[in-house]
Amino acid sequence: MNKPPEKFVHVTEDRLLEFASGCFKKAGTERSHATCISRLLVNSDLRGVRSHGTVTVNGYCRAFEKGDANPKPNIKVLSETATQAVLDGDGTLGYLPMSKASEIAIEKAKEYGVGIATVRHIGHYGSAGHYARICMEAGLIGFSVQGTRNHGNRRDAEEKPKLGYYGNPPICFALPSANGPPIVLDAATCIMADYQRGPEFDVLQEKIPAAFFKSMGYTAVATMLGGGLAGVALSGGEKVANDWPGAVQGGMVLAIRIEGLISEVDFRNEVDRLVSDVRASYEPMPGTDVASLPGAIEEQRMILHREDGIRYGEKEQEQTREVSARLNV
């Protein structure tokens, strides 16, 4: 879980949006593309998900500048049915094509009950929560997941890596509420964070193997739904990866209309009931004051950050200064 920075300055939402958008335009993207990425990154900052916020602007701009990602993609719908669509991201970062895929899935779900869209040939996906939340904010249940081309192939490694750490793709379920915080499981599939490596963590594979088998299974399923189902392994991916070396990922977004299965009002009220009962019935997790389900903390931080400004940590400031100086933004 992302922790609030110990040292920070307050920055307004609008200022970050303007800055990030200016950087992306300088790096070669169209205005609408820059606006899309910036909006999603600032949303992450508002929710306190610092790892996937505007701290990434510097690296993303470098990807556009170096030719690792396509700043001016021609995003196409390759095939489509009443409830399904397949998009080609043309080597760009995942944000714009996955946002388009989410809107398509929403439109289909509202008409037919379920909508699913996959995207192939994209670079970094960002938080899966972006796309599941787009569905949720449209009054639907949202699910999103990412996969990577040739994931799991480490045949060239000098020493075989630990199986318990073999992947950590992003995955998200987003369930709308009535009045309280929604339930949003915005996570990655491995039980360990990417930085949690070493003997003290390796021993856990012996002490709690069931937890690692679960996360290994989640990783395998995520890789196939977000990668295999999206077509990242098809032959056309080789050319895209040669043209845009960072574009080795794919993604999937699923939107489910609640009405037709159950009254939307009843479902939203049941989400509220679950959140309320858990809060009243259970001891909080260590380091927290309230027994909250996933999604509640992000909701609280968004309210706080919109009132007081986003708490912008030292790492974010360092990356912002660097990209500002390089692009003169």
What do these predicted regions represent?
Residues 2-3, 7-11, 16, 26, ...:
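Catalytic-core signal marking the mid-to-C-terminal active-site face
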Residues 150-206:
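Phosphate/diphosphate-binding glycine-rich loops and adjacent basic-rich segments that engage nucleotide
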